[in-house]
């Protein structure tokens, strides 16, 4: 099943039901839908394993950049301790446009004209799209148990002004909408430590110079130090490539 229905950040439906039905029948799934993976990550992986199927979700984070297929095998034997990421191409594009003097509304209009932003861009601008991606990453790489949107401290970019963005550039850095998480502390009462918020970062930070709709993520590990992945974070062709890559992977392993 190639599942790419519209993301529902509250329930994951209808995609969640489609994925459950396919996996329950032993059918592998490739999806670009963030909602079901973020909200029911462990349930769906267990369902896939129980029925001899595979669940692939490369296209849920960083569009066509091969993040999970590269970092997953690449970190075998290492512990990922934390990550920081710019995970929303729409927001990064708008911040870059505001840096050159565009108003917030003008930057949004341009992003919509270019096809980067939806007609109803609230999930992007309010940080919920990034929060879902951070949840997927935390469960994939940091050993998080099931998490909900209520576990994420979220602040979007609606409060940003061109003045704040340009001031950051004058200070030698940049403002970015940063998703971050740390490996959870031990103990049953340990609260997930995931946040999404605009932050000032210095020019030497790997995410400071991301252009346009680019996305990037910096993993900190116990053995290899910092490892950075960057690539296009928005676009239909890029997401379609991620789905195709997953389908080819599933097909190859099914032979």
Predicted regions and their residues:
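Rossmann-fold NAD(P)-binding glycine/threonine-rich loop
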Residues: 7-25, 32-72
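General beta-strand structural signal in soluble alpha/beta enzymes
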Residues: 2-3, 30-32, 55-59, 82-85, ...
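Rossmann-like NAD(P)H-binding beta-loop-alpha module
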Residues: 49-119, 124-129, 136
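Short glycine-rich anion-binding loops that position phosphate/pyrophosphate groups of nucleotides
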Residues: 6-8, 35, 88, 199-201
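ATP-dependent carboxylate/acyl-activation modules
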Residues: 204-255
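Conserved active-site and cofactor/substrate-binding residues in soluble primary-metabolism enzymes
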Residues: 14-17, 39, 62, 66, ...
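Substrate-binding/catalytic subdomain of NAD(P)-dependent oxidoreductase enzymes
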Residues: 97, 108-216
